[in-house]
């Protein structure tokens, strides 16, 4: 999550790694890597502002994009081995890098109108794909070997393209919402896609790759800006944060009353030559039998199973630890908080620990850590 120092001048970027075991923080001076539990500083580098910092699970491979201040560039991607402090790759682009996603097979670099896909083993460029204008760099890459990447198909509607980054083929076109997409997330195994529109009132979850099952969740009735969405590692929960100050945790259950099942013909392989070569009409016609029903469901979407209250207006990211007993929250004003999560109870979660992301972790320092 790129926050650009708007809420704390010392925080430019915040994110978890793929399994939520580490926290990456970009600062005006460089970047830091923390272990999430126990909260400890793993690595720190001060070579200039970092606007994007992405890890590959808990490995030593880290991708960094500059903040654009001083001698750092938003058009330059550095991939470093932080264990040996050795640069692996240095790539320069014509336009600003908006997002970088990695799994064990691919590195995907997202610009406003292009996606570049690289083989992570040798950094060979496999494809450059033209996309519709995507000024926020919205996309999600599955961490697992399903290797799906999803991104908005248009700024004018809520359509989402699903692409296989191994075969470089478009797998599906999903009409998730009526208005444009504001947030996306994929589950660890790549079988679930969560979507939100710019209205931010309804969250949808689709079963991939064919979207033949879906769930709808009610975040609230008042429009909101969705800051982040993350699935739990086992895919049983979805955490959603917004500018309202309430972080919602929804339970994923396709046997519930808010679940829909549809029969859809599986689309055949489509051209890999970019979006301009994709037969949108063919994909849309194959899905026309069920898409209106997805969007205009007659039942009320489900409410959250649990929630967290934080100050409104501050961007945040929420994720569940592997055991689903702790919810972790990162905020743009430099806080890292841990909440007790009871799967048998739900409701409002209680704050257990609070840390400052700008201070050296020290459990004996009352300013750095508050254990409540």
Swiss-Prot record:
Q: GO annotations under biological process? A: autophagy; autophagy of mitochondrion; glycophagy; nucleophagy; pexophagy; protein localization to phagophore assembly site; protein transport
Q: Give a yes or no for keyword Membrane in this entry.
A: yes
List the GO molecular function terms: phosphatidylinositol binding; phosphatidylinositol-3,5-bisphosphate binding; phosphatidylinositol-3-phosphate binding; protein-macromolecule adaptor activity
| Gene3D superfamilies per record | YVTN repeat-like/Quinoprotein amine dehydrogenase
Q: May I ask which residue range the UniProt record assigns to the signal sequence?
A: none
Q: Which UniProt keywords apply?
A: Autophagy, Membrane, Protein transport, Repeat, Transport, Vacuole, WD repeat
SMART domains assigned: WD40
InterPro entries, sorted: PROPPIN, WD40/YVTN_repeat-like_dom_sf, WD40_repeat_dom_sf, WD40_rpt
Q: WD repeats: which residues? A: 176-216, 221-260
Q: Give the record's membrane topology.
A: Peripheral membrane protein
- List localization entries: Preautophagosomal structure membrane; Vacuole membrane
* Chain ranges passing through the membrane: none
| Chief site of localization | membrane
How is this protein annotated for GO cellular component?
Answer: cytosol; phagophore assembly site membrane; vacuolar membrane
Judging by the UniProt lineage, the source's domain of life is: Eukaryota
What family name appears in the similarity comment? Belongs to the WD repeat PROPPIN family.
Q: What does this protein do?
A: May be involved in cytoplasm to vacuole transport and autophagy.
Under which name does UniProt file this protein?
Autophagy-related protein 18
The record lists the organism as Dictyostelium discoideum (Social amoeba)
What are the top taxonomic ranks of the organism?
Eukaryota, Amoebozoa, Evosea, Eumycetozoa, Dictyostelia
What gene, per UniProt, encodes this protein? atg18
């Amino acid at each position: 999550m790129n926050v650009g120092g708007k809420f704390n001048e010392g925080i430019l970027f915040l994110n978890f790694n793929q399994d939520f075991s580490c926290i990456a923080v970009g600062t005006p001076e460089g970047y830091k890597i923390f272990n999430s539990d126990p909260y400890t500083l793993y690595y720190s580098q001060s070579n200039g502002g970092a606007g994007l910092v992405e890890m590959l699970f808990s490995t030593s491979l880290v991708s960094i994009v500059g903040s654009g201040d001083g001698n750092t560039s938003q058009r330059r991607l550095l991939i470093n081995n932080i264990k040996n402090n050795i640069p692996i790759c240095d790539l320069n682009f014509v336009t600003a890098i908006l997002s970088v996603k990695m799994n064990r097979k691919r590195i995907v670099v997202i610009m406003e109108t292009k996606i570049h896909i690289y083989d992570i083993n040798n950094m060979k460029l496999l494809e450059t794909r033209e996309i519709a204008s995507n000024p926020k760099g919205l996309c999600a890459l599955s961490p697992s070997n399903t290797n799906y990447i999803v991104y908005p198909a248009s700024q004018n509607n809520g359509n989402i393209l699903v692409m296989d980054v191994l075969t470089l083929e478009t797998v599906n076109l999903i009409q998730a919402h009526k208005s444009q997409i504001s947030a996306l997330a994929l589950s660890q195994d790549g079988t679930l896609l969560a979507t939100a529109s710019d209205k931010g009132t309804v969250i949808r979850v689709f079963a991939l790759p064919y979207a033949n099952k879906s769930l709808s969740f009610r975040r609230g009735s008042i429009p909101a800006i969705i800051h982040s969405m993350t699935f739990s590692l086992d895919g049983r929960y979805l955490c959603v944060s917004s500018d309202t100050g309430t972080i919602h945790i929804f339970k994923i259950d396709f046997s519930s009353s808010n679940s829909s099942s549809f029969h859809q013909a599986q689309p055949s392989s489509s051209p890999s030559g970019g979006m301009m070569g994709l037969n949108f009409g063919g994909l849309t016609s194959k899905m026309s039998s069920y898409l209106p029903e997805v969007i205009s469901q007659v039942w009320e979407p489900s409410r959250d199973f649990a929630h967290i209250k934080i100050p409104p207006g501050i961007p945040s990211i929420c994720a569940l630890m592997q055991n689903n007993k702790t919810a972790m929250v990162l905020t743009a004003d430099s806080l890292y908080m841990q909440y007790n999560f009871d799967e048998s109870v739900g409701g409002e979660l209680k704050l257990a620990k609070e840390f400052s992301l700008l201070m050296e972790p020290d459990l004996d320092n009352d300013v750095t850590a508050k254990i409540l």
